[in-house]
């Protein structure tokens, strides 16, 4: 029990370090993007490439830590206690779906294109927008870039489906021999059993391998997308991804806190109503008593 608790604590500490590092990278990305859009020189492009390389390195290091810890507590990554219920409802194989990276690219491309059109229409009336420039946002994706992204998107979805089938098979194994038969034959529900422990150990080992495979797919997908995008587009994409990840964690935590507060308030009201209803009732006065 002590070893298991320590493993979970290490996994949570690793996650908190990862979230902290993402927060630190946001101002770095913002600063370099602002410099690139103001000056537009090759030196700033090189700085952006260097920073995006560091961020990919961050992701690889975090995946390596998870791979090491997952062999000791893999099931904790599939429904992490350090996540909010909202995050766990959206989780896939211990993290985000790699295909969601493409949805983010498309969303940013659409929203930034809309902004550019609005600015263009304002410029017709003499409005001058600041910053920008060729290749300065995801709205500047070329036809060649979009084609490459679409091809990669289809390939990654296929990889996701293969992995989803694997985890589905593992989930079904819980209702198969020997776990199901041992549970049925037990006199007392849930009592320790060596055969079950061995079967569950094998299942956790398989889940750990799948987690590593999923993390590798996430890292590989991110690196390939950045390879298609320009330095500015890649940095913009990473900035949006980090802000989305951190925001979802905060939004999920706030929603969970509101639900808990609401439940507490409801219990207080219920207790108050119960107390009032169970109290002594006033006696009715008869006509004789009034006389």
Swiss-Prot record:
Disruption phenotype: Loss of seed dormancy, but no effect on sugar sensitivity (in cv. Columbia). A T-DNA insertion mutant lacking the long version of the DOG1 transcript (isoform 1) but expressing isoform 2 exhibits stronger seed dormancy. Changing residue 15 to A: Strongly reduced self-binding. The keyword 4Fe-4S does not apply. Coiled coil: none annotated. GO terms for cellular component: nucleus. Detected only in seeds. Expressed mainly in vascular tissues of the cotyledon, hypocotyl and radicle of the embryo. Keywords: Activator, Germination, Nucleus, Transcription, Transcription regulation. The keyword Transmembrane does not apply. One of its GO terms (molecular function) is identical protein binding. A shift in isoelectric focusing of the protein occurs during after-ripening, probably leading to its loss of function. Signal peptide: none annotated. It comes from the Eukaryota. One of its GO terms (biological process) is sugar mediated signaling pathway. Residues 8-258 form the DOG1 domain. Induction: Up-regulation by glucose of the Cvi-1 allele, but not of the Columbia and Landsberg erecta alleles. May be up-regulated by the transcript elongation factor TFIIS. Up-regulated by cold. Up-regulated by histone monoubiquitination through HUB1. Down-regulated by the histone demethylases LDL1 and LDL2. It holds the Pfam family DOG1. The Columbia and Landsberg erecta alleles have weak dormancy phenotypes, whereas the Cvi-1 allele shows a strong dormancy phenotype. The Cvi-1 allele shows a sugar-supersensitive phenotype, whereas the Columbia and Landsberg erecta alleles don't have a significant effect on sugar sensitivity. Transgenic mutant seeds expressing single DOG1 transcript variants lack dormancy and do not accumulate DOG1 protein. Simultaneous expression of two or more DOG1 transcript variants encoding different isoforms, however, leads to the accumulation of DOG1 protein and increased seed dormancy. The spliceosome disassembly factor STIP1/NTR1 is required for proper transcript levels and splicing of DOG1. Required for the induction of seed dormancy. The level of DOG1 protein in freshly harvested seeds determines the level of seed dormancy. Determines the temperature window for germination by regulating the expression of micropylar endosperm-weakening genes through temperature control of the gibberellins metabolism. Regulates seed dormancy and flowering time through an influence on levels of microRNAs miR156 and miR172. Regulator of seed maturation interfering with abscisic acid signaling components and activating ABI5. In cv. Cvi-1, enhances glucose induction of ABI4. Homodimer. Self-binding does not influence protein accumulation but is required for full function. Single isoforms are functional, but the presence of additional isoforms is required to prevent protein degradation. This is Protein DELAY OF GERMINATION 1. The gene is DOG1.
